[in-house]
């Protein structure tokens, strides 16, 4: 991310819902939220979900800490996470005219030591423009070229998940991931960031399950 445009200005953020399948769910959720470090983040927890805004690295660190703390109780927990970067799509976007897609550094998370299974989907919301089938993506503002193939970055992301050893299977409307919670979140976030280097507005959604009684 450049120093001229903050993550908030570029619309970098997350919205997530933590679900705990236990009668003591209120305490477990509140304790998990309290256990995470909010430094450098804007956090707003409402009656439906929690909004987080900040750098990609800090957002994912916070999510890992909250989910890990809840899972440490041993009860079945799940988290529904939406990550978004780029405009339009965010109430606080202040992106100057003419700004193309902005890249960001890949995130790195410390191993959690707890298994997570997930369903993951990636949505590039603006196809890159290519002058021909082999050229690099171009800014849309020129009005020339043909739409890029939006499936191309999705297939690349799935390939990356396979290379990382996190890919488990292809399910209906989602890719199944399986591994350490940190590795799952890294795979999801770094694919989201990588696509965002060429496509300004990118959204990814992941549902994570831990300690599930369902055997797979």
Predicted regions and their residues:
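Charge-rich, low-complexity N-terminal segments
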Residues: 2-216
């Amino acid at each position: 991310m450049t120093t001229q445009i903050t993550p908030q200005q570029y619309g970098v953020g997350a919205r997530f819902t933590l679900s705990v399948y236990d009668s003591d769910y209120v305490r477990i959720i509140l304790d998990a939220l309290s256990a995470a470090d909010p430094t450098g983040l804007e956090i707003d927890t409402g009656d439906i979900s929690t909004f987080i805004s900040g750098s990609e690295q800090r957002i994912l660190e916070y999510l890992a800490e909250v989910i890990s703390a809840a899972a440490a109780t041993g009860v079945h927990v799940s988290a529904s996470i939406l990550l978004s970067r780029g405009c339009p799509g965010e109430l606080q976007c202040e992106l100057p005219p003419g700004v193309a897609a902005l890249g960001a550094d890949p995130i790195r998370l410390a191993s959690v030591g707890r298994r997570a299974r997930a369903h993951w989907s990636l949505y590039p919301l603006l196809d890159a423009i290519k002058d021909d089938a082999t050229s690099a993506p171009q800014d849309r503002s020129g009005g020339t070229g043909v739409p890029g193939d939006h499936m191309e970055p999705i297939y690349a992301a799935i390939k990356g998940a396979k290379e990382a050893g996190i890919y488990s299977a292809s399910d209906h409307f989602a890719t199944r991931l399986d591994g350490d919670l940190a590795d799952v979140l890294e795979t999801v976030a770094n694919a989201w960031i990588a696509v965002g280097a060429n496509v300004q507005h990118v959204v990814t959604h992941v549902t994570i399950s831990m300690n599930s009684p369902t055997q797979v």
